[in-house]
């Protein structure tokens, strides 16, 4: 949940990390169900049949939506719904993949379908990967299946995604004759 909070900060949801954490603390029942949904999608998916997986996900989503009806503060409701949106928009993650020594990794990556994330700043890339660790965060935005681009260091901790999005837009224009989509 902490990694998703950092991503919410990058997509300009409008709430600071303290308020997001406070919201999760105020609604531990919903936070627990969000965590269960994440685990179902990315850990239990390897153990359940497609039908059982779909059924379990639908039940968890419905439980979360029902619990959200009792959230009285509009901003808290908005944050919790965005968590649900992010989990549903996550295509893949390395969260449950151990390192070479069988230990938990110190970093996580999430591949999103950004078109499933409401209110995302435009233009919306085709794919987005967010990397989180206590030491570093990063984002890779891609506007096509194949795209030119690379890595860039940013000292803009609060909004590096905005910087990268601007660079990708510029790269799309610059390289339109070569490859019609960009990435950073």
Predicted regions and their residues:
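Extended, well-ordered protein cores
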Residues: 2-184
